Amino acid sequence: MKEVIDTVGRRKTSVARVFMSPGKGRVIINKLPAEEYFRDEVKRQQALRPLALTEKMEDFDIKVNVHGGGVSGQTGAVSLAIARALTEFDESARAVLKKEKLLTRDPRMVERKKFGRKKARKRFQFSKR
């Protein structure tokens, strides 16, 4: 078994690279503790959900490099990358994570703006007369 597992997770325009190794449960995101990087408790729990579900919160040290997008996209990217790393370490975790749909890349992206319109689908105001 490899000492350090590195995986990639993507969501919207965010890309997260996770380096996971056996340790004491430290999570470092872009050289900051997870509590500082994701100040919002809900977003932090969302990002670390794969660890909570598999009850491996204290078993691994995780270093994350994440860039692009906003907080929501980065949260999803980190979550997917951690879930993928957990399955490489422990194949039995795959069933739990798959059931919770944490191993599925969310394909939803921002729809492009079309010409002749205000936004992707919104039209300019129509005047009959």
From Swiss-Prot:
Molecular functions (GO terms): RNA binding; structural constituent of ribosome
Q: Which PANTHER family would you find in this protein's record?
A: RIBOSOMAL PROTEIN S9, SMALL RIBOSOMAL SUBUNIT PROTEIN US9M
Q: NCBIfam families of this UniProt entry?
A: PRK00132.1
What processes does the entry annotate via GO biological process terms?
translation
| Keyword Ribonucleoprotein carried by entry | yes
SUPFAM superfamilies reported for this sequence: Ribosomal protein S5 domain 2-like
Give the protein's recorded name: Small ribosomal subunit protein uS9
Keywords per UniProt: Ribonucleoprotein, Ribosomal protein
Q: In this record, what's one Pfam family?
A: Ribosomal_S9
Tell me the superkingdom of the source: Bacteria
Spell out the PROSITE patterns in the cross-references.
Answer: RIBOSOMAL_S9
Q: From which source organism is this entry?
A: Chlorobium phaeobacteroides (strain DSM 266 / SMG 266 / 2430)
Keyword Transmembrane helix among record annotations? no
GO cellular component terms?
cytoplasm; small ribosomal subunit
Q: Which family does it belong to?
A: Belongs to the universal ribosomal protein uS9 family.
Gene encoding it?
A: rpsI
